[in-house]
Amino acid sequence: MKIEELPSGSYRVRKMYKGQTYTLMFDEKPDQKDVIDYMAKKMKEANVYTKTFEYYAKDYIKSRSNVLSPSTVQTYERLINVISDDFNGLKLSNITQADVQKEINRYAEDHAPKTVRSLHGFIATVLGSYRPQLVLKTTLPQRIIKESYLPSEDDVKAILNAAKGTEDSIAFQLGVLSMRRSEICALSMDDLIGNELHIHKNLVWYKKWIVKETPKTDAGNRTIYLPDTLVQEITEKGYFFKYSPNKLLEHLNKYQDKLGIPRFRFHDLRHYFASYASTIMPEADAMALGGWKSDYVFKQVYRESMRDKRKESAEKYINNILS
């Protein structure tokens, strides 16, 4: 049995077993017993996970169907179908880092980096659940940062004014107050007590539209304060928004087109909230109102929403220096 010390300080052992050579890695120099014990462990694992990756992927989803959100279950089921037959057919115990890298390379040929990362995340999750000893170090495509149009204060006010008195008025105002589409569409009148609106559920699609009683994150379970004018409007109408999240975006797009405003996502109203709220209240309060779980995510949103202002400041600085 030959033991090689590598430049990294690790030790490598190549061991022949039943006509097949196995490469074993150790952090410290092993003795013969260490090698035998490790080989026995590997053989046991190989005998446990004898079915295919596809089998264990479906088993993972089934075993967690009561705790995963419907949208997550739907996404995972879709991802199984886009994985190649070759990879889905691999015996779980035989899957190597090279197999995963090959599958990711194949998928990355005609898919966006974000989609590729989602697929890898699912594969890694399944492998991590059944073979936690397999540590993946897959090379993934670099993220592409797209500069989408972000609404200005004038854009937001124009849309709110145009929507006054319509069935969209309440939903648009709630969007400016940081609410997500799925949260708005799940609201019922008993969520409003006085001026306080309790946000604790989402309308999500899983074969049909269903109300999910738990929020997207723990921070999503929150209470926000509504002004008297908005409370009165909600009380008089007796509802918040009658349609689906998809319809809410369609309605927003109609106003954007009518007013000559570049299209942006309904979610970008949260970005507007982040930039504005950060100027008038402590960061912790803004995060709590918007339901951001971490300051990292909040700051990412805030930095993106302030992009145009940074550009304006940079241009002003350059013009002053060079003029």
How should each PLM-predicted stretch be described?
Residues 82, 90-105, 109-139, 179-182:
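N-terminal DNA-binding recognition helix of tyrosine site-specific recombinases/integrases
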